[in-house]
């Protein structure tokens, strides 16, 4: 570490991270506010609610979380005071749960620590993702592979690494900034593995579908390699002793938390069997359940078997693949119920199982660039969920919202209506 009179300077790889004395003071003020909120009676009660929710099979109240990251550009800039780029990134990370807790009043917790995550990298087949931006929310992936038979030689070994030194430097920086105010904690979030997404990043979806039909052997070989590479990457972290178990308020994909009484929190070093895994396969929504069962699920099922618990799904419908595939996963504990899912079917299947009915409502209910809601539509949506998922363990994760009319009050009202609708 290099110290200066006015600045805290830490070198992170080839990047010099400089936090000015002014920005450091702002971050310390924010850290004090975070600790105040973390120890508030409401946050402490909410933490106990999540613990009870993690233990329950059903019957506990539905938990509701709003994922702010996709629309934070409409709300956070006016709250931010730091000037330096690095300081603003830290400030943004701290503000997210604070805004959820104080402005939205959903079930987001304010942590009594600043989390530092392991710096790691995984490049499937050694092919860096190439994207063409559209100038708006959309983008286009530029493919490497068009025909598996002709382009198979482009598939190299996957590249993966862990930057232990970079992680340590970030931890030291955070401790320097927050010394005496906010503890800094190394955190292992859930492990993620979505092979079909990786394939679509290097091979457009139509070509992937054609390969599934016309070149099954090469498609199987591609899935086999990717599964083996991911497992080697995860095993490397396990063998180096870099993992800690998570069964508490650590991040689980899809806007959820890791709360459960089936895993032990805080084991370090941990094994893969102590951890949550997240997987999805949105890209195969256009193939039949039988094709999914033959070409995709065997590799997913194998990966899932190495972990403690599993959360599955994003925007794809889960009901077509439930009976023949997902229901066979003994450690599945959360499944996404997207807007394209048959809610009643999945409610019937999940009732009494302890598998969380992780409802992802339509983004358009909240995500229109207007300051008000269609309140009747919001209520109807959540009443339908309450009816369909009666007897299930319900969790709401409102995601993929890109605009809210710049109104935190609108989001707060959405949470109020969701709670009212879920009451039946």
Model-derived features with residue positions:
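Active-site loop segments of alpha/beta catalytic cores
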Residues: 2-68, 83, 108-110, 159-424
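An N-terminal, globular interaction/scaffold subdomain
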Residues: 55-127
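A contiguous, low-structure linker/loop signature
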Residues: 121-148
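A gly/proline- and charged-residue-enriched helix-loop-helix capping module
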Residues: 139-168
